[in-house]
């Protein structure tokens, strides 16, 4: 999980155009990119994670935060349409909202990180389950950007 060279460099250049799961997970944790240059999607991923952290700390501000998250999801999806869909044969990207996937990954990362830092034992089943869910979403991201189709143990994609 989250290995640097995990993504195959195929799928009509899409894998090279979009950040891989490792870059997104690093962004969710607030880490800078390896190259020092942020891909726009990495910057938006970092912003989504910050909004999820803010939402956790200030539940009364949830409505405004959720509106901003929706704006970022729409921005990501618009960027994908403008930058990728018109230029390359990437039909597999049309079926899913990449912005919504990044938002779900950001929420899962923030939740897993919170549990890791607040649980009495890091071996707590809830901590493991939260990180496992993030791994499933990271795999979903990889499948979306490479055109793969992966099923979970139960035969369905993670929510």
What are these regions (language model features)?
Residues 1-159:
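Anionic, Ser/Thr-rich low-complexity intrinsically disordered regions
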